[in-house]
Every structure is written in structure tokens, then in C-alpha cells.
Amino acid sequence: MLILTRRVGETLMIGDEVTVTVLGVKGNQVRIGVNAPKEVSVHREEIYQRIQSEKAGNPSEGGNF
């Protein structure tokens, strides 16, 4: 795992087309902005896991969203 230190307003690059920018820090929360091409899916981890579970035929409890 690569570990980086960034300040508010600073950006990191992932490949040639994806940027991640630190927008703000408040307590233990960090706001980030992700700029990626439309064909690149960007999800929070818990949403990504739910999508993968539903694709595998295991819908999450609570059902409709």
C-alpha cells in the first residue's frame, strides 16, 4: 500500500486520467474529490461491496434503495 500525505487542495494522480483531491479536513473526516472518466466506476467501499453482492445473487438485507 502506498501511503501519501496531502494537504487541503493538493491532488494525487492515479494513472493518466484519475485525480483525487483533498477538499477538506474536519476532525477525523476527510472530504475528497475524485475526477475520473465516465467509463471508470467510482464508489465508496460499502456501496461497491453491495453492488458485488447483488451481482452474485445475494441481495443485501433491507432490499429497496
From Swiss-Prot:
InterPro entries (alphabetical): CsrA, CsrA_sf
Single GO MF descriptor: mRNA 5'-UTR binding
Superkingdom: Bacteria
Cellular component terms per the entry's GO annotation: cytosol
Main location: cytoplasm
UniProtKB keywords: Activator, Cytoplasm, Repressor, RNA-binding, Translation regulation
Intracellular or extracellular location(s): Cytoplasm
Gene Ontology biological process terms, A to Z: mRNA catabolic process; negative regulation of translational initiation; positive regulation of translational initiation; regulation of carbohydrate metabolic process
Pfam families named in the record: CsrA
Key word Amino-acid biosynthesis present: no
Stated role: A key translational regulator that binds mRNA to regulate translation initiation and/or mRNA stability. Mediates global changes in gene expression, shifting from rapid growth to stress survival by linking envelope stress, the stringent response and the catabolite repression systems. Usually binds in the 5'-UTR; binding at or near the Shine-Dalgarno sequence prevents ribosome-binding, repressing translation, binding elsewhere in the 5'-UTR can activate translation and/or stabilize the mRNA. Its function is antagonized by small RNA(s).
Self-association state and partner proteins as the record states: Homodimer; the beta-strands of each monomer intercalate to form a hydrophobic core, while the alpha-helices form wings that extend away from the core.
Record-linked PANTHER family: CARBON STORAGE REGULATOR
NCBIfam families the record matches: csrA (TIGR00202), PRK01712.1 (NF002469)
Family assignment from sequence similarity: Belongs to the CsrA/RsmA family.
Descriptive protein name: Translational regulator CsrA
Gene from which this protein is expressed: csrA
